[in-house]
């Protein structure tokens, strides 16, 4: 399956930014994170309970990897991921932060969303804390550099994209309306 335009950029930046990392935070793979999203009603705050949940997530992750491709797992993960500010899933995140559909995201916009997946609170581009907003910009630039190293964008394109500020069209989604 070959995607074109920004859909390809999203897929490629996510693959580079997430799949090629050994974990997605807390020592878990993307498959394990998806298992936790899909099948854990409430993540235990108690360490002992959490230790009991982890093996179940591992078993589910192995089953996910048996039945789905990496791309399908990644799609499910992005469709369930909480990008903060009522933006659950890549479609809502694209709309919330940039006012567009995922297929219309620019490379630097997709890179910012991918960067948030590592730790949305630390890389929240609309945080009141200016340091956290700086973190979001820095993380976006790391994802762009990873895309350049993987050959998805040129060095010159990476440099020009990294020079851009975070241009948001932020609109908080109210699901109660």
Regions found by a protein language model. Name each.
Residues 1-5, 9-10:
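Single conserved hydrophobic/aromatic residue that forms the stacking wall/gate
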Residues 11, 19-24:
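Active-site-surrounding "flap" and adjacent substrate/cofactor-binding loops of secreted or lumenal enzymes
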Residues 12-17, 95:
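Short amphipathic alpha-helical surface micro-motifs
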Residues 15-20, 102:
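Active-site-adjacent loops and short helices of periplasmic peptidoglycan-processing enzymes
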Residues 26-177:
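Non-catalytic, structured segments within soluble enzyme domains
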